[in-house]
Amino acid sequence: MAHKKGAGSTKNGRDSNAKRLGVKRFGGETVKAGSILIRQRGMKFKPGVNVGYGKDFTLFALIDGTVKFDYKDAQHKRVNIITQ
């Protein structure tokens, strides 16, 4: 039996908690004002019409309406809220 744990074994065994990032409301869904649309790191998706963003880059609806995704240009995705 070894009297030592082996090199590095006590330095391992940790992992961070999942951050639950991603799209929370998809295109065509009806949302209320204040609903979180996307949680992200950085500006992967840009806020469009009637969409605000928080200090952690969370996109949220400013008014009641329907979610619509489009492209601002070739590489920038944008989220809009369209009124009924």
From Swiss-Prot:
* Subcellular localization, as worded in the UniProt entry: Plastid, Chloroplast
Cellular component GO terms, alphabetically? chloroplast; mitochondrial large ribosomal subunit
Any one GO MF annotation of this record: structural constituent of ribosome
User: Which family does the record assign?
Assistant: Belongs to the bacterial ribosomal protein bL27 family.
Q: What name goes with this protein?
A: Large ribosomal subunit protein bL27c
The record's listing under PROSITE patterns reads: RIBOSOMAL_L27 (PS00831)
Going by the UniProt record, its keywords in alphabetical order are:
Chloroplast, Plastid, Ribonucleoprotein, Ribosomal protein
Q: Where is this region: Disordered?
A: 1-23
Primary residence: plastid
Q: Which is one Pfam family of this protein?
A: Ribosomal_L27
GO biological process terms, alphabetically, are: translation
HAMAP family assigned to the protein according to its UniProt record, in alphabetical order = Ribosomal_bL27
